[in-house]
């Protein structure tokens, strides 16, 4: 990303780079941009090293869920593949990402109205447990999955995007609304 940033800077091109909530360990949640990143794996470490926080470049920390074109290995695709089965839903795994559809709309809004944003900004939804998220997807997509509450895994990588929302006035829909839009788009 840093080489790409240099090329963009040289050619007066705006770079919008994507980072992840995985730059944080998940030990506390509600992370702000000012919180010290503490990744716990190579993915989080590599994404942190790639963040651009200089010049006119924009790094967006976020996470998203939605359909995949090829691999079909994302959380969303896995949930859909569990139709008519029984699975565990982690009630202490807290998530604040967006659907891919909503994220695309946010990026479009940034390009159209907020191209002056630069530095590292976090974009997130209201926090939700993976258990509750699976319930919403299960209901909307009529998957007939029996979801068991599981509290054995704990991770809260929820992001606080109050700064972004205040600066841009971009409103992130509820999880019910985002999943409904994803359903209607499929």
Question: Residue locations for each model-derived region?
Answer:
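NAD(P)-dependent short-chain dehydrogenase/reductase
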Residues: 40, 52-95, 100-102, 108-109
């Amino acid at each position: 990303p840093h080489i790409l940033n240099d090329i963009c800077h040289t050619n007066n091109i705006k770079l919008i780079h994507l980072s992840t909530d995985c730059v944080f360990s998940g030990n506390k949640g509600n992370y702000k941009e000012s919180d010290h990143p503490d990744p716990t794996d190579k993915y989080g470490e590599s994404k942190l090293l790639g963040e651009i926080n200089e010049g006119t470049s924009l790094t967006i920390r976020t996470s998203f869920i939605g359909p995949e074109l090829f691999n079909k290995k994302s959380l969303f695709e896995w949930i859909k593949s569990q139709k008519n089965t029984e699975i565990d839903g982690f009630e202490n795994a807290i998530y604040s990402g967006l659907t891919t559809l909503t994220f695309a709309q946010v990026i479009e809004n940034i390009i159209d109205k907020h191209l002056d944003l630069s530095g590292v900004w976090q974009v997130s939804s209201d926090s939700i447990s993976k258990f509750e998220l699976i319930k919403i997807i299960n209901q909307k997509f009529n998957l007939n999955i029996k979801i068991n509450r599981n509290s054995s895994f704990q991770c809260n990588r929820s992001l606080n995007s109050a700064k972004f929302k205040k600066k841009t006035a971009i409103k992130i829909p509820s999880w019910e609304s985002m999943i409904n839009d994803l359903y209607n788009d499929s």
